[in-house]
Amino acid sequence: MQQALELALDRAEYVIESARQRPPKRKYLSSGRKSVFQKLYDLYIEECEKEPEVKKLRRNVNLLEKLVMQETLSCLVVNLYPGNEGYSLMLRGKNGSDSETIRLPYEEGELLEYLDAEELPPILVDLLEKSQVNIFHCGCVIAEIRDYRQSSNMKSPGYQSRHILLRPTMQTLICDVHSITSDNHKWTQEDKLLLESQLILATAEPLCLDPSIAVTCTANRLLYNKQKMNTRPMKRCFKRYSRSSLNRQQDLSHCPPPPQLRLLDFLQKRKERKAGQHYDLKISKAGNCVDMWKRSPCNLAIPSEVDVEKYAKVEKSIKSDDSQPTVWPAHDVKDDYVFECEAGTQYQKTKLTILQSLGDPLYYGKIQPCKADEESDSQMSPSHSSTDDHSNWFIIGSKTDAERVVNQYQELVQNEAKCPVKMSHSSSGSASLSQVSPGKETDQTETVSVQSSVLGKGVKHRPPPIKLPSSSGNSSSGNYFTPQQTSSFLKSPTPPPSSKPSSIPRKSSVDLNQVSMLSPAALSPASSSQRTTATQVMANSAGLNFINVVGSVCGAQALMSGSNPMLGCNTGAITPAGINLSGLLPSGGLLPNALPSAMQAASQAGVPFGLKNTSSLRPLNLLQLPGGSLIFNTLQQQQQQLSQFTPQQPQQPTTCSPQQPGEQGSEQGSTSQEQALSAQQAAVINLTGVGSFMQSQAAVLSQLGSAENRPEQSLPQQRFQLSSAFQQQQQQIQQLRFLQHQMAMAAAAAQTAQLHHHRHTGSQSKSKMKRGTPTTPKF
């Protein structure tokens, strides 16, 4: 079957090509009148016999135009006008002049569709029959299409003409039957059917009854060659650029697009905008361009001298404000800068607030849009606002930094708005804004992390800060330290002796997740190898203040001594062999009148204390307890005292004996000095005397020692009883007990260092045993 079909297609191609080159001649009756089809066939044979004037061109085309010119046949004229003028129909009269009968717009394209299909429109049958000139030729009508749309001269427009033969269809035959039978004669239904059959036979083309499949293939090939450019996809493309379609698009462009076509409208406008851009691209002439592929490498000689001053740009460096003295304000200072601008139709108004709280040398800033309730928001300082408002304030620094922030923000607003910016400034100050109620100060939990730069060379990375749970049980205080919280711990009427007092509140932080860093042994009973009588301090409801001193102490020894100031420390500079804690805390004592006079006298006497052999020291933890003692505690004692950490009833504080230093020197014997030098003992130091703290407080230094705990040293243990306030805070105590696991892990990590210092500590103790009366250790 496939082979037969291929043979039929080849036969069809051969028949078409032979008929085109050598068409056969037909014989007609001599007495008969030739039809328009016979005339076209004879003209086709005549043109095929002639030699073409130009090779590869055929003459047997445009036969209908040649026939009209030879015989001057009457035809129907269709004019296609440019723009929105539409099209019209014209009929030729007896005098030879053409008269326009119908003029229609392009939107009514039904008549044009019949002309495109070369079919006789049924609506024109009655009009054409009533014309003065007979334009029918064997039932067909010759139409001349005059196209004025391609003419460039509108004054005397020319046109392109082509002829088509409109053939009758079944609809036109029905119209003919109806017009013939509409006279006064009576036509039966059988007569009408007989008339219709005769009309179909007279107008139908001759049939080919050859059963070969090649006949069908030939007919299909001829029809395809005739309608190859008249398919539905081609018609759809042509209609897209037709006049009716362009008019519809122009009308819709003035109307708002529907919601479904907003994206399409946006893309269309962007496409038109990009198409309208003209680029000035100049193509250089041949020979003027540089061939990048064949260009030789450029070898430039290095100049011997370069004028640096000609190309250099001098930029002034920003000087640090460390040399400027820190000013502790006596009341709150708040500056409001309001920036107003009108960019187009939008009015923008923002406010920059610069705030300096009482007792805090740092400046804080806040940027917010101006609203109706801006007055209520501006009355809240960073230290008294809610925890949700902490994120709105940011640390600026010194006064010079605050001025720089104002200038930079003004330039930023002016650059974004691209219009003049109006700035108004208002300043206000009130000392009542920074006062803290007693209840709030009690509930606060303060954590200060001091960098290792205070102690010399230490670790590079700061360990995570420690957060103690507040007495109220509220965990919302886990935000960063506010200026008021910092100033409550470092509050002093005079500038502190530290060279950088602002380094503590800048790097302060609170983290509730790091509560496990605090050793529970810091709250356990303190013990001392010197048999020092530990003062039982009554703890009040004040919060716990904790300072984490990061990094190890540099140097071979660390000496801390002094008189009246806190921790018995000097206010001098930090020497390579010692640590000065006066830079950590403000000058002045801790307990103004909270402890007995005996303890005050003992602390005012200025008993020095020393820490030697600091190569085995670990980061120090300074815990400020609501009491009056300073406890140095080590890892081994913390583990022994962990089981004894139970809340007890508060007891009255007892005073230390003035003969305590001498008593220690007599009873300790030859081992007192090496015990004082080791990191395994606990010493109690009374903190009394001057200070500006509102409540009686103490500090606990918890040191993780790395020396080996020798069995011959039995350290007496003493209970450090807490008040009933801690008994009510069971949640705090449970959280502190969870640190046992982490302390055990720290002890395991210190075993390597303990083995390293075992021989050194043994030889040192033997050498000191041979000496005379040991010196009194300093506290």
Swiss-Prot record:
Q: Which GO terms describe its biological process?
A: autophagy; gastrulation; positive regulation of DNA-templated transcription; regulation of DNA repair; regulation of RNA splicing; regulation of transcription by RNA polymerase II
Query: Which superkingdom heads the taxonomic lineage of this protein's source?
Result: Eukaryota
GO cellular component terms, alphabetically, are: nucleus; SAGA complex; SAGA-type complex
Q: Where is the composition biased (Polar residues)?
A: 445-454
Disulphide connectivity of cysteines:
none
Q: Which GO molecular function terms does the record list? A: transcription coregulator activity
* InterPro entries per the UniProt record, alphabetical: Spt20 (IPR021950), Spt20-like_SEP (IPR046468)
Task: Give compartment(s).
Answer: Nucleus
**According to the UniProt entry, which residue ranges have a biased composition of type Basic residues?**
755-771
As for what it does, the entry says: Required for MAP kinase p38 (MAPK11, MAPK12, MAPK13 and/or MAPK14) activation during gastrulation. Required for down-regulation of E-cadherin during gastrulation by regulating E-cadherin protein level downstream from NCK-interacting kinase (NIK) and independently of the regulation of transcription by FGF signaling and Snail. Required for starvation-induced ATG9A trafficking during autophagy.
Protein name in the entry: Transcription factor SPT20 homolog
Lineage, broadest ranks: Eukaryota, Metazoa, Chordata, Craniata, Vertebrata
Q: Gene name on record?
A: SUPT20H
